[in-house]
């Protein structure tokens, strides 16, 4: 493990590709170093888990409804057969409050995402010029990353 990870190559690859798949050693440490380097370069960062993400575009960017868990017999007259739907603010809403900064969304446990969900993450990056996304796709013996589009081609097309 190098003592100094400048993050220059990572920053350049992130700027050119906008969406990266990263493979980090399981003992950790690299992620926080890279996040700290990106914050120093002017990025506003947000880290979250990819588990339970559902539709990434709606869950991350738009106001959406979530039904609370069913707790047994309830009155059907008030809410109908569908139940009560509570509105939830987008998970990454604090990222989008500032329009002047570059934004970095870091998704942990990205290996649970399907091909279509990964493709929608790439589409989100292309629609928003200031948004970049890093998806952790699993462990590796050394820190590696590649464009998410290349990862999809390698992983799902073979």
Swiss-Prot record:
GO terms for cellular component: plasma membrane-derived thylakoid membrane. It catalyses: a plastoquinone + NADH + (n+1) H(+)(in) = a plastoquinol + NAD(+) + n H(+)(out); a plastoquinone + NADPH + (n+1) H(+)(in) = a plastoquinol + NADP(+) + n H(+)(out). Its main location: membrane. The keyword Transmembrane helix does not apply. It holds the Pfam family NdhN. The keyword Disulfide bond does not apply. Keywords: Membrane, NAD, NADP, Plastoquinone, Quinone, Thylakoid, Translocase, Transport. Its EC number is 7.1.1.-. It is a peripheral membrane protein. GO terms for molecular function: oxidoreductase activity, acting on NAD(P)H, quinone or similar compound as acceptor; quinone binding. It comes from the Bacteria. InterPro entries: NAD(P)H-quinone_OxRdtase_su_N. It is found in: Cellular thylakoid membrane. It is an enzyme of class 7 (translocase). PANTHER family: NAD(P)H-QUINONE OXIDOREDUCTASE SUBUNIT N, CHLOROPLASTIC. NDH-1 can be composed of about 15 different subunits; different subcomplexes with different compositions have been identified which probably have different functions. NDH-1 shuttles electrons from an unknown electron donor, via FMN and iron-sulfur (Fe-S) centers, to quinones in the respiratory and/or the photosynthetic chain. The immediate electron acceptor for the enzyme in this species is believed to be plastoquinone. Couples the redox reaction to proton translocation, and thus conserves the redox energy in a proton gradient. Cyanobacterial NDH-1 also plays a role in inorganic carbon-concentration. Belongs to the complex I NdhN subunit family. This is NAD(P)H-quinone oxidoreductase subunit N. The lineage of its organism: Bacteria, Bacillati, Cyanobacteriota, Cyanophyceae, Synechococcales.
């Amino acid at each position: 493990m190098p003592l100094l990870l400048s993050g220059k190559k990572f920053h350049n690859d992130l700027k050119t590709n906008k969406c990266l798949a990263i493979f980090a050693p399981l003992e950790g440490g690299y992620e926080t170093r890279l996040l700290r380097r990106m914050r120093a370069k002017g990025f506003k960062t947000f880290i979250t888990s990819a588990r339970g993400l559902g539709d990434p575009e709606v869950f991350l960017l738009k106001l959406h409804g979530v039904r609370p868990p069913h707790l047994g017999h309830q009155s059907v007259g008030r809410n109908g057969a569908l139940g009560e739907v509570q509105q939830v603010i987008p998970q990454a809403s604090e990222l989008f409050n500032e329009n002047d900064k570059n934004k970095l969304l870091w998704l942990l446990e990205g290996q649970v995402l399907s091909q279509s969900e990964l493709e929608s993450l790439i589409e989100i990056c292309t629609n928003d010029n200031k948004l970049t996304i890093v998806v952790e796709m699993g462990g590796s013996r050394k820190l590696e990353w590649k464009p998410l589009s290349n990862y999809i081609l390698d992983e799902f097309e073979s």
